[in-house]
Regions:
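Juxtamembrane/disordered regions of integral membrane proteins
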Residues: 32-52, 60, 97-98, 136-143, ...
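Hydrophobic alpha-helical transmembrane segments
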Residues: 33-34, 72, 76, 186-191
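Hydrophobic alpha-helical transmembrane segments and adjacent short intramembrane/lumenal linkers
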Residues: 106-190, 197-203
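Membrane-interface segments at the starts/ends of alpha-helical transmembrane spans
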Residues: 61-74, 148-156
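Alpha-helical transmembrane segments of polytopic integral membrane proteins
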Residues: 14, 86-90, 168, 172
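N-terminal juxtamembrane cytosolic/stromal segments of multi-pass membrane proteins
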Residues: 1-66
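Alpha-helical transmembrane segments with an aromatic anchor "belt"
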Residues: 64-133
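Membrane-interface helix-boundary motifs at transmembrane edges
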Residues: 20-30, 98-105, 176-185
Length: 203
């Protein structure tokens, strides 16, 4: 029978993830994913209202409500794209490494979800900075403030985000420790992930 853990103790096990990750169940995965989706949705709605107040886009109350709902849904779904991207990348890596584990997919999904939290924190930070400073659609935690006349440069700078990089390296660490890999792999995989994202931004 799978052992269940209190959701508030999840991060306490980040330094000893092997036994913890291998003991997780579907309920714990959902309990961790749910607040991330809710938090992301709230951040998206707040950011939407901050931007809307500045440019006065609303023409009616109904339009405002519909727009808010759409933004909230998109905000809730957005983390899934990153988490599934993490999952697919590391699942392919695990296939190449021939990693054998009864809970391989579940473990990768779980550590992918944990690793998204720095990005969620960045969303909160950007909302706060947008409130107290001039609104910046692309956020304050990346390099988009640099003005360089080069195609797709804004998209590239958006990927060079300190919290996205922290997220990538956190996942690399959790992956290598959970599956007993070499320490150097905790650097190789995150760097590869960041480079791939930059290359995709160039397309």
């Amino acid at each position: 029978m799978e052992k269940s853990y209190n959701i508030f103790l999840l991060y306490k096990s980040i330094l000893k993830p092997i036994e913890f990750v291998q003991s997780i169940n579907r309920v714990n995965s959902f309990l961790l994913l749910l607040p991330i989706m809710i938090g992301s949705s709230v951040m998206a709605i707040l950011n939407f209202y901050i931007h809307s107040d500045q440019i006065h886009t609303f023409t009616s109350l109904n339009f405002e409500k519909i727009s808010c709902i759409i933004v909230g849904v998109i905000g809730a779904i957005a983390p899934l794209f990153t988490i599934m991207g993490y999952f697919c990348f590391y699942y392919v890596v695990s296939l190449f490494l021939v990693i054998e584990s009864e809970k391989l997919k579940r473990s990768i999904f779980f550590i992918s979800t944990i690793s998204y939290t720095p990005i969620l924190f960045a969303s909160l930070l950007n909302v706060l900075l947008n409130i107290f400073f001039e609104y910046r659609p692309t956020g304050f935690t990346n390099l988009t403030f640099l003005s360089i006349d080069f195609p797709n440069m804004t998209a590239i700078f958006a990927e060079i985000d300190i919290f996205k990089i922290i997220s990538a390296f956190l996942l690399g660490y959790l992956f290598t420790v959970t599956f007993s890999r070499e320490k150097i792999e905790a650097v190789i995989y995150p760097v590869t992930w960041v480079v791939l994202n930059v290359l995709v931004a160039l397309i």
